[in-house]
Amino acid sequence: MSIRKRLTQEESRTAAVEAARALLIELGPQAVTLKAVASRIGRTHANLLHHFGSAAGLQKELARYLAVTICATIEAAVLASRAGQGTARDVVDLTFDAFDKEGGGALASWMLVNGNEDALDPIVEAIHDLVDDLGEFGSGANRQSTLALCLMAMGDALLGGPLTLSLELPRDSARDTAEAMLVAAALQSGLPVAG
């Protein structure tokens, strides 16, 4: 008979959120249930209820986790780009991948469809903090390009494949447009442009 290691509250929450992220990427947002996450980490449904209160609570925490980790990655790419060690395309690809491959777009749309709009607050706050941390909040051009980049990435994650196919455009068309937009915004703001 094996004895399970007792996890701290923070360790349990972290394990659950990481399992939820894996389920999101593998199977989509509908798979992120308390039962599925509990099964994946070897805990009980009641244990997860204790930590998150509901599936919506777990999804909100997952959204916060994704937003914080993704924004940290994007911030590093922006800073590298400004230092001449990265490109606008790096920022675009990370943002688009966050909404597509990392499941951010699917999770956001799933939460909206299910009436859980407040669960998107961590995403919106993390993006705002990212812009603020990068010292761009005072610049209207950069705020607008951040908004456009995020909306383009979200739209591409949800409809990009079928829409580019229908319009007979290359699959990366939205990414190309976003890159051109970021380069133009950087030039307008007097920021260095690499690549």
Where are each of the predicted segments found?
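Helix-turn-helix
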Residues: A15, A19-G57, E61
